[in-house]
From Swiss-Prot:
Keywords: Ribonucleoprotein, Ribosomal protein, RNA-binding, rRNA-binding. The gene is rplR. PANTHER family: 39S RIBOSOMAL PROTEIN L18, MITOCHONDRIAL (PTHR12899), LARGE RIBOSOMAL SUBUNIT PROTEIN UL18M (PTHR12899:SF3). One of its GO terms (cellular component) is cytosolic large ribosomal subunit. This is one of the proteins that bind and probably mediate the attachment of the 5S RNA into the large ribosomal subunit, where it forms part of the central protuberance. This is Large ribosomal subunit protein uL18. GO terms for molecular function: 5S rRNA binding; structural constituent of ribosome. GO terms for biological process: translation. InterPro entries: Ribosomal_uL18_bac-type, Ribosomal_uL18_bac/euk. Part of the 50S ribosomal subunit; part of the 5S rRNA/L5/L18/L25 subcomplex. Contacts the 5S and 23S rRNAs. Pfam families: Ribosomal_L18p. It comes from Buchnera aphidicola subsp. Acyrthosiphon kondoi. Belongs to the universal ribosomal protein uL18 family.
Length: 117
């Protein structure tokens, strides 16, 4: 089993458990150059809020889009948008990525901005 398929396997297992709980989930995806985050409805069929380093408003603040500062900016923007829509509590789905570095920076920034998980 290679690294990618192991990550996808971990993500699938966690996603299944969160679906059983019926919780709104904060999903994170990380690529070498960008960070993406979405808040997905409990039924899994609707993206309620999204933010990424591809957005012009976030990119203008940053020098590089693939570091911890960029991840923190995405987390803060996502949390602000979620709170505007009345979403205060989510479950964190790290998509099989290790809770370290950019994933952790995004989560910490979202918590500081007011999201609970």
């Amino acid at each position: 089993m290679d690294k990618k398929s192991a990550r996808i396997r971990r993500a699938t297992r966690a996603r299944r458990k969160l679906k059983e709980l019926g919780a709104t989930r904060l999903v994170v995806h990380r690529s070498p150059r960008h960070m993406y985050a979405q808040v997905i409805a409990p039924n899994g069929s609707e993206v309620l809020v999204a933010a990424s380093t591809l957005e012009k408003a976030i990119t203008e603040q940053l020098k590089y889009s693939g570091n911890k500062d960029a991840a923190a900016a995405v987390g803060k923007a996502l949390a602000e948008r979620a709170l505007e829509k009345g979403i205060a509590k989510v479950s964190f789905a790290r998509s099989g990525f290790q809770y370290h570095g950019r994933v952790q920076a995004l989560a910490d920034a979202a918590r500081e901005a007011g999201l609970q998980f």
